[in-house]
């Protein structure tokens, strides 16, 4: 046995801002490991020969190898291993749900807590960022071919980075004024500081990736025009940014927001800051509908804007889809959870402003097709919550613009682009797609995995079709 192995059954805790302090600022909640803590946690890794953790990583990071280098204190080598497969390690170390992926299959987790893989990933990425002259990844010899990437979210960034390393000339087309996609507009700074996102994107630009913002492909430039304009292939990674609503009375009242709008105003338009050009309405009592990570983000932002916040969710605590860590942080900060609660109407005054939300009390019945117990209405148990703002955080779907403006580009009835089974190939030759645009809203790391897979398929396609 390795004499330096750390046999502790528990992972090193993550230092965080105290709830009383952080509930009134947008600074990062988690503070990160120091070198000693990172090395001690890394020594908990058994270095399993079969590396089940790597199989649980959508981008295939060589997890035991990079952790072994952390244990040795060779952080530069750890970075080389980590960054070879993950172009956004500082992002993933903060927002990836490792507990459901790599850490879920960690052998140490069978008799205690899993190795804190995500925290170690974050540590290595932050250590690298702190170096005066961080080393840029190397690229293969230029292939003399151009590839267009539509969307600069996780899928697009991962695809672009992989292609650039292969030697392709890559241009990303982004509809917004700043790159990052959902990483920029959807995740608050207290979970993902924007300077970290910008630095990781700058790392891709050092590989030669060009980013063209304020360009809506499908409207400003048709997809077909990209192929005619010298691009040998196109990757569609436009995400799923169209918010869902419940279709209940009152959703058009003043004070009803989609979580997308609420978070975009705060993250991109700085609406929570004094003197903002597009300020948020000064809500005092906010109800957030939904139980996922987006609901937690919207609720915690509303809290930091000075409101009392209640999250309503139609199932129980065990069924909450948000990360356990995010739920715990929200509760620590003073957010109220009303579980087994389903809105049926948003109430308003004679001027059209929100005054409350009427809800049914629910009970859990038999499992539905998702495997979760189906929520059923409890008769005679309806009630009303007073509020002056409601935020709908019940999911998103892909924007139909691309398939509606591109002849022959197939999509399903939900607007998700369709691809060949097990592949990223769309119905159009030379056009590939992946991430939320194909699957619907999912996780950052799954989108990145799809982007990497698409890059490999594009490379294979162009090798087989050298005339393109």
Task: Put a short name on every predicted segment.
Residues 146-171, 295-303:
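N-terminal Rossmann-like FAD-binding beta1-loop-alpha1 element of flavoenzymes
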Residues 77, 141, 146-150, 198-248, ...:
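Feature captures the FAD/FMN-dependent oxidoreductase FAD-binding
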Residues 55, 60-139, 205, 213, ...:
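Glycine/serine-rich phosphate-binding loop and adjoining beta1-alpha1 elements at the start
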Residues 87, 153-155, 178, 292-294, ...:
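Residue-level detector of alpha-helix initiation sites
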Residues 169-172, 176-207, 211, 299-345, ...:
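Rossmann-like dinucleotide-binding cores of NAD(P)H-dependent redox enzymes
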Residues 124-141, 199-219, 243-305, 412-422, ...:
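Glycine-rich dinucleotide-binding loop and its adjacent helix/turn
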Residues 252-283, 367-441:
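FAD-site-proximal beta/loop scaffold in flavoenzymes
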Residues 298, 437-465:
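A conserved FAD-binding loop/helix module that cradles the flavin
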């Amino acid at each position: 046995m390795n004499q330096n192995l750390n046999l502790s059954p528990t992972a090193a805790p993550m230092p965080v801002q105290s709830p009383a302090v952080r509930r009134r600022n947008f600074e990062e909640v988690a503070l990160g490991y120091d070198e000693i803590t990172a090395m001690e946690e890394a020594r908990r890794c058994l270095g399993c020969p079969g590396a089940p953790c790597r199989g649980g990583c959508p981008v295939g990071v060589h997890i035991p190898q990079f952790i072994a280098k952390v244990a040795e204190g060779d952080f530069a080598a750890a970075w080389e291993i980590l960054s070879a497969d993950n172009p956004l390690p500082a992002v993933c170390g903060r927002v990836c749900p490792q507990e459901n992926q790599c850490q879920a299959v960690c052998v140490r987790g069978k008799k205690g807590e899993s190795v804190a893989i995500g925290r170690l990933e974050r540590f290595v990425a932050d250590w690298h960022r702190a170096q005066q002259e961080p080393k840029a990844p190397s690229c293969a010899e230029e292939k003399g071919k151009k590839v267009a990437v539509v969307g600069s979210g996780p899928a697009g960034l991962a695809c672009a980075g992989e292609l650039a390393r292969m030697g392709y000339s890559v241009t990303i087309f982004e509809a917004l004024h700043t790159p990052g996609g959902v990483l920029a507009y959807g995740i608050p700074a207290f979970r993902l500081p924007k300077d970290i996102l910008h630095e990781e994107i700058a790392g891709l630009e050092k590989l030669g990736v060009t980013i063209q913002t304020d360009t809506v492909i499908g409207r400003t430039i048709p997809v077909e025009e990209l192929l005619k304009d010298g691009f040998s292939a196109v990757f569609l990674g436009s995400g799923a940014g169209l918010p869902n609503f419940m279709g209940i009375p009152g959703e058009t009242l003043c004070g009803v927001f989609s979580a997308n709008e609420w978070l975009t105003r705060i993250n991109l338009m700085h609406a929570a800051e004094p003197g903002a050009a597009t300020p948020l309405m000064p809500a005092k009592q906010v109800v957030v509908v939904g139980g996922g990570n987006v609901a937690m983000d919207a609720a915690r932002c509303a809290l930091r804007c000075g409101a009392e916040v209640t999250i309503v969710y139609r199932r129980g605590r065990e069924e909450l889809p948000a990360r356990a860590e995010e739920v715990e942080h929200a509760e620590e900060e003073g957010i109220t959870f009303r579980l087994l609660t389903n809105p049926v109407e948003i109430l308003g005054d004679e001027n059209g402003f929100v005054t409350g939300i009427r809800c049914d009390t629910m009970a859990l019945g038999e499992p539905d097709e998702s495997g979760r117990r189906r929520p059923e209405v409890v008769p005679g148990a309806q009630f009303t919550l007073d509020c002056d703002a409601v935020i709908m955080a019940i999911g998103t779907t892909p924007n139909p613009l691309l398939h509606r403006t591109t002849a022959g580009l197939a999509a399903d009835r939900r607007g998700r682009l369709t691809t060949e089974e097990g592949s990223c190939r769309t119905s159009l030759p030379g056009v590939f797609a992946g991430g939320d645009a194909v699957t619907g809203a999912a996780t950052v790391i799954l989108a990145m995995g799809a982007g990497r897979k698409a890059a490999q398929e594009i490379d294979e396609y162009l090798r087989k079709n050298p005339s393109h």
